Amino acid sequence: MSKKPVALIILDGFALRDETYGNAVAQANKPNFDRYWNEYPHTTLKACGEAVGLPEGQMGNSEVGHLNIGAGRIVYQSLTRINIAIREGEFDRNETFLAAMNHVKQHGTSLHLFGLLSDGGVHSHIHHLYALLRLAAKEGVKRVYIHGFLDGRDVGPQTAPQYIKELQEKIKEYGVGEIATLSGRYYSMDRDKRWDRVEKAYRAMVYGEGPTYRDPLECIEDSYKHGIYDEFVLPSVIVREDGRPVATIQDNDAIIFYNFRPDRAIQISNTFTNEDFREFDRGPKHPKHLFFVCLTHFSETVKGYVAFKPTNLDNTIGEVLSQHGLRQLRIAETEKYPHVTFFMSGGREEKFPGEDRILINSPKVPTYDLKPEMSAYEVTDALLKEIEADKYDAIILNYANPDMVGHSGKLEPTIKAVEAVDECLGKVVDAILAKGGIAIITADHGNADEVLTPDGKPQTAHTTNPVPVIVTKKGIKLRDGGILGDLAPTMLDLLGLPQPKEMTGKSLIVK
């Protein structure tokens, strides 16, 4: 008996917008896509911003898109998750933060807040520091000290003064907090085992060692005079009139490290939390019985409390198909192979039982605008053989071209990329329909829909435009207002499988 496969076909970087100028999707000759769009139920999905777990207005990307598609739910990235917690009041109820604050109140000790002092949003966000200051004031914590790591990398190289001034205004507004040390991220956020750098930051915070200044802005001005900008500012100590440090980290203090990205937070965290630390001599005043809080899970090696614990993605589409004994195929060329495997499975490398994978090599060319068809024809040929062999109940396929060629910001090659994919799409969908199967044709984010700026310059970034979804089954109706997290529930619906509770997305098929 022949299988009737349900195929999820992802046209990477293929979104829709009305304006045709600079729009390779609109300008391409794509008879197959147009035929399916006209003949079958269709709608559009939001693939950016909070709909995929990113900050509102932020463009989607392939990793985030495939995570959301496979998970069948919104997968919140750390920055967004914390922003939402602040907005909805959950941040102020966080048990780990409250425990740290109770610890210092019970011991009559100090709370130290350290992290990257910018709104770059890559490693940290200064608004999270402000939320902690506000919470400390609300909880009646009196001694709150800030150890600011200066950025200059994810933001401009001489932006520290504006962040320090803004922080000083917040300190005044909340009536709590003092800046105790400043250090360029080169020292405090090293990740390359340059322990001499980390040691300088540590000794400033614990021993009050390093250049001293009465005023944080004076520290920055002095560095700038010597041609040393934010990222490289030497770990420096802010002192009172009598020359003593505003604060050093001592026994029974609490630390909240408000960076959310782990890689550059691990070394300095290990310096404070590891009993077996051997990288440099921490000296006689190394603080004991610290209550150390990481904003997110940094590493197994960091012995601290975690404020926002990782969310495990259980019951992704691949796992559910496997649990029901269905055979599934994941297929893509090199550029998007991790996306249909690792990211589609919620960050899991191993295959599920009953899952097969086909990797087609991407062409070896300097840039893909030189070969806009990439390996789409080879992917298609390999897939047509598998459809013919009647092996799979479910297929997940990615065509990389609209995204990878779209990144060139060149219109003509991107039009050719879309046309090549359309030709392949026609062959695959018609083969699936011939078997009595169903195709879900969609995309993960925009790109090829906007490859020129209004003044004709290359536009190489992703877009925030809606992506299409077509379900090649007549007699059904699709609802509007969907998100990428609704695709897995739709696929399960078409396969007649129950949706697990972890999948909070909803089938697009109107019942």
From Swiss-Prot:
<dbReference type="InterPro" id="IPR006124">
    <property type="entry name" value="Metalloenzyme"/>
</dbReference>
<feature type="binding site">
    <location>
        <begin position="261"/>
        <end position="264"/>
    </location>
    <ligand>
        <name>substrate</name>
    </ligand>
</feature>
<dbReference type="InterPro" id="IPR005995">
    <property type="entry name" value="Pgm_bpd_ind"/>
</dbReference>
<dbReference type="GO" id="GO:0030435">
    <property type="term" value="P:sporulation resulting in formation of a cellular spore"/>
</dbReference>
<keyword id="KW-0464">Manganese</keyword>
<feature type="binding site">
    <location>
        <position position="403"/>
    </location>
    <ligand>
        <name>Mn(2+) 1</name>
    </ligand>
</feature>
<keyword id="KW-0413">Isomerase</keyword>
<feature type="active site" description="Phosphoserine intermediate">
    <location>
        <position position="62"/>
    </location>
</feature>
<dbReference type="GO" id="GO:0006007">
    <property type="term" value="P:glucose catabolic process"/>
</dbReference>
<comment type="similarity">
    <text>Belongs to the BPG-independent phosphoglycerate mutase family.</text>
</comment>
<dbReference type="Pfam" id="PF06415">
    <property type="entry name" value="iPGM_N"/>
</dbReference>
<feature type="binding site">
    <location>
        <position position="444"/>
    </location>
    <ligand>
        <name>Mn(2+) 2</name>
    </ligand>
</feature>
<feature type="binding site">
    <location>
        <position position="185"/>
    </location>
    <ligand>
        <name>substrate</name>
    </ligand>
</feature>
<feature type="binding site">
    <location>
        <position position="62"/>
    </location>
    <ligand>
        <name>Mn(2+) 2</name>
    </ligand>
</feature>
<dbReference type="Pfam" id="PF01676">
    <property type="entry name" value="Metalloenzyme"/>
</dbReference>
<feature type="binding site">
    <location>
        <position position="12"/>
    </location>
    <ligand>
        <name>Mn(2+) 2</name>
    </ligand>
</feature>
<feature type="binding site">
    <location>
        <position position="123"/>
    </location>
    <ligand>
        <name>substrate</name>
    </ligand>
</feature>
<comment type="pathway">
    <text>Carbohydrate degradation; glycolysis; pyruvate from D-glyceraldehyde 3-phosphate: step 3/5.</text>
</comment>
<dbReference type="GO" id="GO:0043937">
    <property type="term" value="P:regulation of sporulation"/>
</dbReference>
<dbReference type="GO" id="GO:0004619">
    <property type="term" value="F:phosphoglycerate mutase activity"/>
</dbReference>
<protein>
    <recommendedName>
        <fullName>2,3-bisphosphoglycerate-independent phosphoglycerate mutase</fullName>
        <ecNumber>5.4.2.12</ecNumber>
    </recommendedName>
</protein>
<feature type="binding site">
    <location>
        <position position="462"/>
    </location>
    <ligand>
        <name>Mn(2+) 1</name>
    </ligand>
</feature>
<feature type="modified residue" description="Phosphotyrosine">
    <location>
        <position position="36"/>
    </location>
</feature>
<comment type="function">
    <text>Essential for rapid growth and for sporulation. Catalyzes the interconversion of 2-phosphoglycerate (2-PGA) and 3-phosphoglycerate (3-PGA).</text>
</comment>
<feature type="binding site">
    <location>
        <position position="336"/>
    </location>
    <ligand>
        <name>substrate</name>
    </ligand>
</feature>
<dbReference type="GO" id="GO:0005829">
    <property type="term" value="C:cytosol"/>
</dbReference>
<keyword id="KW-0479">Metal-binding</keyword>
<keyword id="KW-0749">Sporulation</keyword>
<dbReference type="GO" id="GO:0030145">
    <property type="term" value="F:manganese ion binding"/>
</dbReference>
<keyword id="KW-0324">Glycolysis</keyword>
<dbReference type="InterPro" id="IPR017850">
    <property type="entry name" value="Alkaline_phosphatase_core_sf"/>
</dbReference>
<feature type="binding site">
    <location>
        <begin position="153"/>
        <end position="154"/>
    </location>
    <ligand>
        <name>substrate</name>
    </ligand>
</feature>
<keyword id="KW-0597">Phosphoprotein</keyword>
<feature type="binding site">
    <location>
        <position position="407"/>
    </location>
    <ligand>
        <name>Mn(2+) 1</name>
    </ligand>
</feature>
<dbReference type="InterPro" id="IPR036646">
    <property type="entry name" value="PGAM_B_sf"/>
</dbReference>
<dbReference type="GO" id="GO:0006096">
    <property type="term" value="P:glycolytic process"/>
</dbReference>
<feature type="binding site">
    <location>
        <position position="191"/>
    </location>
    <ligand>
        <name>substrate</name>
    </ligand>
</feature>
<dbReference type="InterPro" id="IPR011258">
    <property type="entry name" value="BPG-indep_PGM_N"/>
</dbReference>
<comment type="subunit">
    <text>Monomer.</text>
</comment>
<feature type="binding site">
    <location>
        <position position="445"/>
    </location>
    <ligand>
        <name>Mn(2+) 2</name>
    </ligand>
</feature>
